[in-house]
Amino acid sequence: MGFPKVERLLINYKTLDEFKKFKGCGAQELSMLEELQANIIENDSESPFYGIYYGGSLIARMSLYMKRNGGEPFEITGTYLELYKLEVLPTFQKQGFGQMLVNYAKQLQFPIKTIARIQSSGFWDKLSFQPVSVTDGDFYIWHPETNSNAITNEESA
């Protein structure tokens, strides 16, 4: 068995069965089962769902959506990612699988917005996300480090 890696999940009946394992493990707001059922098209490769398989079973998952212009008070302009419903099965928690999912999103090099749920603020703090409080709730933002060696269009010949 190879080292687990993050992969885009196909929207199909196998994934639907895998999602059922998460039902009852977490809070209702983390449930993706209904979202998957509503969008089921066999083997849709444009799925917003990403996960980690271990031993042939899905053990961790998240939703990742590309958005534009977070505006005030989000401190995000342009394209950014919304990371939702990150969940790791209880048996596999505290083994780095949640961090693997977040690092996968980070390597795309877009700002990331997420909502900390179920006493997870320490997790997001550890991964260099910054808390932002607004009147309708709290969330966390991560900004990619800017590469000072990058050449912009204005600087190129």
Swiss-Prot record:
Keyword Acyltransferase part of the UniProt annotation: yes
InterPro entries from the UniProt entry: Acyl_CoA_acyltransferase (IPR016181), GNAT_dom (IPR000182), YlbP (IPR017274)
Annotated disulfide bonds: none
All residue ranges annotated as the N-acetyltransferase domain in the record: 9-154
Top-level lineage group: Bacteria
One GO molecular-function entry: acyltransferase activity, transferring groups other than amino-acyl groups
Keyword Transferase: yes
Key words of the record: Acyltransferase, Transferase
Record EC number: 2.3.1.-
Matches recorded under Pfam families: Acetyltransf_1 (PF00583)
Name this polypeptide is given: Uncharacterized N-acetyltransferase BcerKBAB4_3748
